[in-house]
Regions:
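Metabolite-binding pocket within alpha/beta catalytic cores that recognizes anionic/polar moieties
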Residues: 1-115
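Short acidic/polar active-site loop segments enriched in Thr and Asp
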Residues: 65-66, 166, 185
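Internal active-site segments that recognize and position negatively charged phosphoryl groups
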Residues: 113-134, 157
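Non-catalytic positions within long, well-ordered alpha-helices that form the structural scaffold/packing
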Residues: 60-63, 161, 180
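Zn-dependent metallopeptidase/amidohydrolase metal-coordination segment
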Residues: 170-189
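Active-site/ligand-binding-proximal alpha/beta "capping" segment
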Residues: 129-166
Length: 189
């Protein structure tokens, strides 16, 4: 595979969160060209908020059709413990900043985009089938996105559960919105 440090790519920031390497890796996997981002920014880092557009548009321009994302998130269900895999079926955003705010580039998508089926049904079916073939338990749930960096209070956790969320985190939603805007088939675990 070819590895491109974010620092060598125009529009890609240096990352400050431990464990986020900051690399674009392109290689072959079972006959398919695969592009992988190692690392992401978070809104709480106060980094340029255009980064979710940059990564998803880069993926679109190099020919990607699918956008699969992973994250470390917290469970709001006692039945889903640490280390569990949860496939996201929808989200609630409390990030307080939509990454599509600002000038729109029609090359990547329309000014206004519907958010139904953001988590592409056929992609979710493939993820479920893959988990089953590997004998992995794959939970499903709604992701609640918060700004961070502080964790939630007990009262907030109760409120988020009441709103229908199963997992919570400080990332993912901005790039999901941008990937959907670009027409990529989104799946998140």
């Amino acid at each position: 595979p070819e590895v491109f440090p974010f620092s060598d790519l125009a529009g890609f920031p240096e990352l400050s969160v431990a464990g986020h390497g900051g690399e674009l890796i392109i290689g072959q996997l079972h006959g398919f060209t695969v592009a992988c981002m190692r690392g992401r920014t978070h809104y709480y880092e106060n980094i340029e908020h255009g980064f979710p557009k940059t990564i998803t548009r880069t993926m679109k321009l190099i020919g990607c059709q699918y956008f699969l994302s992973t994250n470390a998130s917290g469970s709001l269900r006692e039945s889903v413990g640490p280390g569990s895999l949860v496939m996201i079926t929808d989200h609630i955003s409390f990030n307080f900043n939509n990454p599509l705010v600002g000038p729109n580039d029609e090359e990547f998508g329309p000014r206004f985009i519907g958010m139904e089926n953001v988590y592409h049904p056929a992609t979710r079916d493939r993820l479920k089938a893959s988990a089953k073939s590997l004998d992995l338990t794959l939970h499903e749930g709604v992701y609640f996105g918060v700004l961070g960096p502080s964790f939630e209070t007990p009262a907030e956790i109760r409120a988020y559960r009441t709103l229908g969320a199963e997992v919570i985190g400080m990332s993912t939603i901005p790039e999901v919105i941008c990937a959907h805007h670009c027409g990529l088939h989104v799946g998140v675990i």
